[in-house]
């Protein structure tokens, strides 16, 4: 029996085993985003998800030394998909609400926003006199809920599967006003071809709207890791660099 071969062979097996452990040690995390809420999440010309949400997810993954994948999912399918384990977390500019907290858990906020109306430049706007107006919003959002709670029976309400379709109907004249999160609307006004024809109407409200990363109910381990990584990118300036890439002011 050749002792050298035995020792060498054992060393190779040990090395392979350690390598396997090292590979397995990296957490595999699948994030879902919508891909239709620029500049927070959108699909680029190469078909890849990009945006503020995506950059934050990548920064968190780097801090956690995790093996991450970012996939897209229609808005209405995000929470159902999370619950059936299609993905591990949702980073899609999702507001932390009491209703959502009944079915998912959230990390600490990673930014805050508010709601704001938008309409054509020069059109008169009176929040207390919107009878007969056609107002649009994306379905299953805080904006849609606000309209249902306050304008059902008073104005014509239209809801859409994604924000891009809201903008399309506004430009086409099928909507008089839209209600949306202030920050993506700001981006649309600044960057779209039609943005110069429209303007904010009134001031922002519900500005305590905190946005978090959703995880499955009871997934405290992943929630804690994400919160720790978020604290780290806030402390070392990485968050601020990502913020500045998209907005000239802090959104935290």
Where are the model-predicted features located?
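Sec/Tat signal peptide C-region and signal peptidase I cleavage site
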Residues: 19-25
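Periplasmic-binding protein-like
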Residues: 35, 111-116, 182, 190-227, ...
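Short helices/loops that flank or line small-molecule/ion binding pockets
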Residues: 62, 71-72, 76-88, 103-105, ...
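Flexible hinge/capping segments at coil-to-helix
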Residues: 119-135
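Ligand-binding clefts/hinges and TM-proximal coupling segments of bilobed small-molecule sensing domains
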Residues: 142-160, 196-201, 230-252
């Amino acid at each position: 029996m050749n002792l050298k071969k035995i020792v060498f062979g054992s060393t190779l097996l040990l090395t392979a085993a350690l390598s396997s452990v090292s590979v397995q040690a990296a957490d595999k995390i699948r994030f879902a985003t919508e891909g239709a809420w620029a500049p927070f999440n959108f699909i680029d010309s190469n078909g890849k998800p990009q945006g503020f949400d995506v950059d934050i997810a990548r920064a968190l993954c780097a801090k956690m030394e995790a093996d991450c994948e970012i996939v897209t999912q229609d808005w209405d399918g995000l929470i159902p998909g999370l619950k059936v384990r299609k993905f591990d977390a949702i980073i899609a500019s999702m507001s932390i609400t009491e209703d959502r907290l009944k079915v998912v858990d959230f990390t600490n906020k990673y930014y805050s926003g508010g709601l704001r109306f938008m309409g054509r430049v020069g059109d008169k706007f009176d929040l207390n006199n919107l009878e007969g107006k056609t107002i649009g919003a994306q379905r299953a959002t805080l904006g849609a809920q606000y309209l249902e709670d306050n304008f059902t029976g008073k104005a014509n309400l239209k809801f859409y599967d994604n924000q891009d379709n809201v903008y399309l109907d506004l430009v086409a004249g099928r909507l008089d006003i839209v209600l949306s999160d202030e920050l993506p609307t700001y981006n649309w006004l600044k960057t779209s071809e039609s943005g110069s024809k429209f303007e904010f109407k009134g001031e922002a409200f519900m500005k305590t709207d905190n946005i978090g990363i959703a995880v499955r109910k009871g997934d405290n381990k992943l929630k804690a890791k994400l919160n720790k990584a978020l604290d780290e990118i806030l402390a070392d300036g990485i968050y601020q660099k990502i913020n500045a890439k998209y907005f000239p002011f802090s959104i935290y």
